[in-house]
């Protein structure tokens, strides 16, 4: 006899009828789009849970894991690839991700942190305590650890503490076509894709002298062969690394920007603060678990 595994992908749903109507409107929807249903983990093994979670976005998977017991949560986390688990940890609240990270062996935890965005990794290491943070940093790839340590020296709610160190940085003799090619990369977050940063060599943060920015919309209006140095905005607003969150949020709102460059005392670009970085710090700690705040 041949046994097959069945996985739920779509469900037919119907609204409850009102008045004399026996049936309400109906539709067929993806199971991954259904919210408000708790997973009954008692009847599911880890492999079945993983199959259920395959197509979930990282934020939705983090929400689903929150409803599981710690034991089952750890089982799922151990089965996820490093990059996938890193994405999920970035979407968890402080208590959940610290608890989960503590259950992983240190080598695996260090590998996962190395896959996180540097600013999120710095936030997580601040949360686990100095001793454990040092142990994990020692196990990380030196280049990854250096980026994270650079961020950890800033206050959590400052521009330096919230910034990412991996914006799109190009030289003045790069072309519009080259800039758009970077922006098209799937892994570039929307906030970072909103503009490119023009600097002198070196182009990795901390860069050479910061020149200015070119907004994505400007790139779309210019011929592909145009040099960035010809269209760069040299009067763009910038932030100091010690700027507090109120200053950062006010400037983003005032200039209607999705991101802003952070410049040190030597006029070097050291990072970029995005709107989502600021929102993560402004929203209540438990906002991720409020069902009425989730997109439906």
Question: Predicted segments — roles?
Answer:
Residues 1-296:
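Hydrophobic packing positions in regular secondary-structure scaffolds
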């Amino acid at each position: 006899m041949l046994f097959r595994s069945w996985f739920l992908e779509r469900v037919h749903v119907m609204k409850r009828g009102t008045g004399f109507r026996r049936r309400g409107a109906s539709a067929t929807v993806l199971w991954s789009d259904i919210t408000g249903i708790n997973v009954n983990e008692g009847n599911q093994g880890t492999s079945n849970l993983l199959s259920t979670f395959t197509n979930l976005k990282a934020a939705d998977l983090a929400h689903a894991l929150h409803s599981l017991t710690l034991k089952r949560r750890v089982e799922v986390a151990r089965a996820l690839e490093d990059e996938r688990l890193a994405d999920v940890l970035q979407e968890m609240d402080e208590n959940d991700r610290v608890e989960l990270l503590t259950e992983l062996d240190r080598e695996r935890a260090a590998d996962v942190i190395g896959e996180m965005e540097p600013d999120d990794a710095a936030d997580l290491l601040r949360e686990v305590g100095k001793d454990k943070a040092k142990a994990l940093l020692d196990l990380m790839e030196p280049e990854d650890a250096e980026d994270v340590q650079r961020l950890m020296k800033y206050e959590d709610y400052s521009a330096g503490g919230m910034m990412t160190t991996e914006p799109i940085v190009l030289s003045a003799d790069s072309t519009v076509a080259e800039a758009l090619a970077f922006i098209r990369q799937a892994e570039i977050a929307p906030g970072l894709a909103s503009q490119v940063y023009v600097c002198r060599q070196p182009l990795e943060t901390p860069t050479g002298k910061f020149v200015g920015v070119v907004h994505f919309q400007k790139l779309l209006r210019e011929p592909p062969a145009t040099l960035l140095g010809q269209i760069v905005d040299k009067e763009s607003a910038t932030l100091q690394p010690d700027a507090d969150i109120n200053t950062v949020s006010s400037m983003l709102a005032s200039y209607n920007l999705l991101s802003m460059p952070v410049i040190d005392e030597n006029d070097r670009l050291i990072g970029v603060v995005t709107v989502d970085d600021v929102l993560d710090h402004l929203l209540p700690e438990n906002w991720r678990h409020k069902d009425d705040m989730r997109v439906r």
